[in-house]
Amino acid sequence: MSNNSFPHEAFDDLLAANAEYQKNFKYSELTGSAAKGLAIVTCMDSRINPLSVIGMKSGDVKILRNAGARVTEDVLRTLVLATYLLNVNRILVMPHTDCKMAENDEADFHKLIDEQYGVNTSSLEFRTSRDQRGSLAIDLNRIR
């Protein structure tokens, strides 16, 4: 296999699950707008199920996820579109406890990735913060 070959078999389970999802799709009545007028910005941590946390269901909310639940330029762009085009009138920024992004600083993550994987990530800003409350205040101010 050449370096440019795509390992399709690595996604067979996902393709099978998607076929089943299509066959049993139960959300065709949803419009794509946020039925409850809410957007959530939260962490990519797979332990978090944002809909369950706030007692909502598919179609109610726009969910944006990234490392550390930070309001980046791309998140802000998406929130603007959701607000003006997709019925969002409330935004919940929802970081969480025990977040890896609050355990280290930028230099630590760059060093770790370089040492363990040989990949130089110094051109990226990970937006780590040991002060989650301070970061939340900054992010809320960006939204305002």
What are these regions, as identified by a protein language model?
Residues 1-34, 69-76, 81-86, 101-144:
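Divalent-metal-activated hydrolytic enzyme cores
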Residues 18, 40, 64, 93:
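Divalent metal-coordination and catalytic microenvironments
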Residues 20-24, 29-58:
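N-terminal short beta-loop-beta anion/metal-coordinating cradle
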